[in-house]
Regions:
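Conserved acidic residues
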Residues: 28, 61, 137
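Predominantly a Rossmann-like dinucleotide-binding segment in NAD(P)-dependent oxidoreductases
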Residues: 117-193, 198-201
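Beta-strand-loop-alpha-helix segment that lines the small-molecule cofactor/substrate pocket
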Residues: 62, 69, 73-118
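N-terminal Rossmann-like dinucleotide-binding module
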Residues: 1-44
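Short acidic low-complexity segments
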Residues: 46-59
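C-terminal helix-rich "cap/oligomerization" subdomain common to oxidoreductases
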Residues: 62-65, 109, 215, 280, ...
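Contiguous beta-strand/loop segments that form the cofactor/metal-binding neighborhood of enzyme cores
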Residues: 172-252, 287-300
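Glycine-rich, N-terminal phosphate-binding loop of Rossmann-like dinucleotide-binding domains
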Residues: 66-67, 143
Length: 317
């Protein structure tokens, strides 16, 4: 199978790294219109790279779209028109969603959307325990990191997280809300307080405090920011018979034993960490969603869809 990775920034490199490490039968091609980046990735990962998909003479079978989100829509459309199965990183805007969904159906191709937390063992365990408990619960969740620390090697004004339509808080919400809805039930209502706490030259709010009501009766407080100088993911879930705590990593998931009154660690699967990233970034979850993409090509249902994401983006808007 010929696999094109389009966009050779941090996410494109991650996908290439995992594809080379765990899927040895694939031929991997890199695509990036930045000549310097294209050459660098070709040298570092020993893959053929091109400036445009049209330069790749052989027929590709699928594409990973890993560019900045504002460019996804047109690239996805081109890939589908070329009869490629498509894996897309999160989009943040729903441009061409309906058109690309219809095009994928017409072409008989898989249109797959990343939602990495859904593939984390911790999230799947949390979901299982909340469902098993069977009662409405409350939760508090804080996720944030100071915006310039996301990619310190990039100039902030050149990075899509500083763009109003694809900003850092919007990305965090697009990452977190799908699993929150999966665990606690369909979102019924939200109330939001938003403000700016930094002196960063940005044209969007840097802090959101959100109260969420779910159709199941669950309620939550969600704090999302690009202010916190400590990268943080901190979750507490509770009701009369349940208490769960998680700090974003596989070894930080705890549940209170109601009988013994002791907090007990819950083993939460495999942890693969890449140097230079927050400890909350588990490469294993990225690997699992790549596997799900290839399974979806063979007919298995994906964990997340463009249709579901369209609804999440409406909530964010």
């Amino acid at each position: 199978m010929n696999v094109c990775v389009i966009g050779l920034g941090s996410m494109g490199k991650r996908r290439i790294r995992l594809l080379k490490q765990f899927f040895h039968e694939l031929k991997i091609i890199g695509i990036d219109n930045n000549l310097e980046r294209m050459k660098s990735v070709s040298t570092e990962y020993k893959v053929d790279c091109y400036l445009a998909l049209s330069e790749f003479g052989e027929k590709a079978d699928c594409a990973f779209v890993c560019t900045s989100p504002q460019f996804h829509a047109s690239i996805i459309k081109e890939c589908l028109e070329r009869n490629l199965h498509v894996f897309s990183e999160i989009n943040l805007i729903d441009k061409l969603y309906d058109e690309n969904i219809r095009l994928a159906e017409q072409k008989g191709k898989t249109l797959f959307l990343s939602s990495t937390p859904l593939y984390k063992d911790e999230i799947q365990l949390i979901r299982s325990k909340v469902k098993q408990n069977g009662r409405p619960c409350a939760y508090q969740y804080h996720v944030g990191q100071y915006l310039p620390d996301w990619h310190p090697w990039d100039k902030l004004d050149k990075f899509f997280i500083s763009n109003k339509s694809t900003n850092g808080c919007r990305e965090l919400l697009a990452i977190e809300l799908p699993w929150i809805q999966s665990v606690f039930g369909r979102i019924k209502a939200v109330k939001t307080t938003k403000t700016n706490l930094t002196d960063l030259k940005i044209d969007f709010y840097d802090t959101f405090l959100i109260q969420i009501e779910h159709e199941t009766g669950a309620v939550g407080n969600l704090a999302v920011d690009v202010v916190s100088r400590q990268a943080v993911r901190r979750l507490e879930i509770f009701n009369e018979e349940l208490y769960i705590r998680w700090n974003g990593t596989p070894n930080s998931l705890y549940e209170k034993d109601i009988i013994s009154k002791q907090l007990k660690q819950i083993p939460a699967g495999t942890y693969i960490h890449e140097s230079g990233y927050s400890e909350a970034i588990n490469e294993y979850a990225y690997l699992k969603e790549i596997e799900n993409f290839f399974e979806a090509i063979e007919g298995k249902e994906a964990l997340y869809s463009f249709e579901e994401d369209k609804e999440i983006l409406k909530i964010i808007d």
